[in-house]
From Swiss-Prot:
This is Large ribosomal subunit protein uL22. SUPFAM superfamilies: Ribosomal protein L22. One of its GO terms (biological process) is translation. One of its GO terms (molecular function) is rRNA binding. Belongs to the universal ribosomal protein uL22 family. One of its GO terms (cellular component) is cytosolic large ribosomal subunit. InterPro entries: Ribosomal_uL22, Ribosomal_uL22_bac/chlpt-type, Ribosomal_uL22_bac/org-type, Ribosomal_uL22_CS, Ribosomal_uL22_sf. This protein binds specifically to 23S rRNA; its binding is stimulated by other ribosomal proteins, e.g. L4, L17, and L20. It is important during the early stages of 50S assembly. It makes multiple contacts with different domains of the 23S rRNA in the assembled 50S subunit and ribosome. The globular domain of the protein is located near the polypeptide exit tunnel on the outside of the subunit, while an extended beta-hairpin is found that lines the wall of the exit tunnel in the center of the 70S ribosome. PANTHER family: CHLOROPLAST 50S RIBOSOMAL PROTEIN L22-RELATED, LARGE RIBOSOMAL SUBUNIT PROTEIN UL22M. Part of the 50S ribosomal subunit.
Amino acid sequence: MESSAKLSLARLSPRKTRTVADLVRGKGIQQALNTLSFLPNPSAQILLKLLKSAVANAEQKGVNDIDKLFVKTIFVDGGAVLKRFVPRAMGRASKIRKPTSHISVVLSDTKTR
């Protein structure tokens, strides 16, 4: 049985978040939670909360053994980019880009590819 969780418009860079997501892809749920809990990245804390949400969704669906769950798919897509301007010298302005991410996690209890 599969369970999923999604997060839209997270104020994280997709490029930096993908590196953390690659660490837990395909791993067991306990190993993934332990890995994310010891990483100092802000994106690791967001992914940790998202994984816990997916586990809670699995419990609501009636999965009996949570320890058999593993991260089937996890992917990070780019979201809308917030654009801000900063005043510069001689009346100019520079653009500041604040990227956002859409993160999706799917947990499964059977290892079928």
